[in-house]
Amino acid sequence: MEEEVDGATHLRRAEDALRAGDPMSAAAHYAAAGDAAPFEATALGFLDKGQDDALALYLRSRLDAADPTREPETVTKLAAWLVDLHVSRVCGAESGTVAAQNATKDLRLFIAAHWSSLDIVATRNLLEEYRLFDDLAHFLETAGAVRESVDLRLTIGDVAGVLRTLRQNNKVSPEDIEQVLPRAFRTDPIETSFFLRSRTLVAKLGGEHLVSLVSKIAIGILSE
């Protein structure tokens, strides 16, 4: 009973804050009200009025308070709303501006912190729809789909991103490296050549495998 009273009190304070023109306070009170505030109506209310900062505060507060073990569907829904909001900010910012850089940084920080709460297929489709392929590669790598991330980067010609992943990610297998580097070499032979001479690659593959890989690349060049 006490929780219902608390929820009702927060709802009244949220409505008072909206009437006073303070959407941020309203968002905080709606979040504190929990399920006493109908989620869809509350979120859409902020969205329809263009109050994105208040919407983000409401969603983040609800997500922080939710228990992934007991409320997995709620957590997934909140995370989906938030990633969609982050994507909207990225797409709404002018390319090359500080605002665009900050929006991209915020999106990737959110993905890094909450990837396990996101629906992988839905998030992949969202990022593909808006052609945010670099962010999609980042998401896939964060979610553990490292080879898929590397293949995507190869497709979009991001050899620097491919080599960075091969260098830094311990989940990349020697087999993956041997399959990926010939493709990377065809796209950017200079950067790939530098990587082939790196100590990192020697440590990951070993001398014998590295010699075999270089031979494979050389044969590929001669056969073209």
What would you call each of these model-derived segments?
Residues 1-224:
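Extended alpha-helical solenoid/arm regions of large eukaryotic scaffolding proteins
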